């Protein structure tokens, strides 16, 4: 993911 609030990287 490109966002910090992503449950799984």
Swiss-Prot record:
Secreted recorded as keyword: yes
State the Gene Ontology terms under molecular function. Answer: neurohypophyseal hormone activity
Disulfide cysteine pairs (residue numbers): 1-6
* UniProt keyword terms in alphabetical order: Amidation, Disulfide bond, Hormone, Secreted
Q: Glycine amide modification sites? A: 9
Might you report a single GO cellular component term? Answer: extracellular region
Q: Would the keyword Flavoprotein turn up in this protein's UniProt record?
A: no
Compartments reported by the entry: Secreted
InterPro entries reported for this sequence: Neurohypophysial_hormone_CS
Q: Which family does it belong to?
A: Belongs to the vasopressin/oxytocin family.
* The protein's name in its UniProt record: Valitocin
Source organism per entry reads Squalus acanthias (Spiny dogfish)
